[in-house]
Regions:
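Surface-exposed helix-capping loop/turn segments at secondary-structure junctions
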Residues: 21-22, 90-101, 142-148
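Short, mixed-charge aromatic SLiMs
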Residues: 37-43, 132-146
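Charged/polar, low-hydrophobicity segments characteristic of intrinsically disordered regions
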Residues: 51, 141-157
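Amphipathic alpha-helical packing segments from all-alpha helical-bundle domains
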Residues: 74-92
Length: 182
């Protein structure tokens, strides 16, 4: 029987349990696991809505729908992004990783989401612990960097193709104009 899962955190939990991953990824200890689950449950309401939705609405929705959004319409996501980064900074100011002193799938999820902020040229200078953690996560997880490099290549190709087919009338997601005002 084929198992089909469509939610990223469900997939991460399943893989951590079914593949014999080291315990730190998704701890057997219920208290530690609850910390990981807590972050994963918060992730979609803060970081995903901040980074993911902002990137989609600002950069890719205009290519798909032909409709642009005003800065005022994007402000909601900028506020969520600022709050999410403050939450990450608070956690990472106390511990090396989001849920303690060992890396977990919560860190992997957050790092992947934040790495996509390259599309909006987000600077993390206001959040030094978060910035250091993200660079550490990227350095320690070469596969993540490799996969994201492939995704950036596909995205740049997508943008270039859209510009070519639509007379260049599009905000380049790799330009400074795509950066949110935090």
């Amino acid at each position: 029987e084929t198992l089909t899962l469509s939610e990223s955190h469900t997939i991460l939990r399943y893989l951590a349990r079914s593949r014999g991953c080291a315990d730190h990824w998704y701890p057997a200890d219920l208290r530690q696991r609850a910390k990981v689950d807590e972050y994963l449950d918060q992730h979609h309401n803060f970081l995903r809505q901040g980074v993911g939705a902002y990137c989609f609405i600002k950069l890719f929705a205009p290519m798909i729908t032909g409709q642009s959004y005003t800065d005022k319409e994007l402000d909601f996501h900028v506020v969520l992004l600022s709050r999410a980064l403050a939450m990450l900074e608070a956690r990472l100011s106390k511990h090396r990783y989001l849920c303690g002193d060992q890396v977990s799938i919560a860190d992997l999820s957050a790092a992947c989401e934040l790495d996509s902020s390259r599309y909006i040229e987000l600077t993390l200078d206001k959040w030094p612990a978060t910035k250091a953690w993200l660079y550490h996560m990227i350095d320690e997880n070469a596969t993540m960097l490799e996969l994201h490099a492939k995704m950036r290549k596909v995205s740049k190709s997508f943008v270039a193709n859209h510009k070519e087919n639509n007379g260049g009338a599009f905000l380049d997601p790799f330009s400074a104009a795509a950066t949110p005002k935090l």
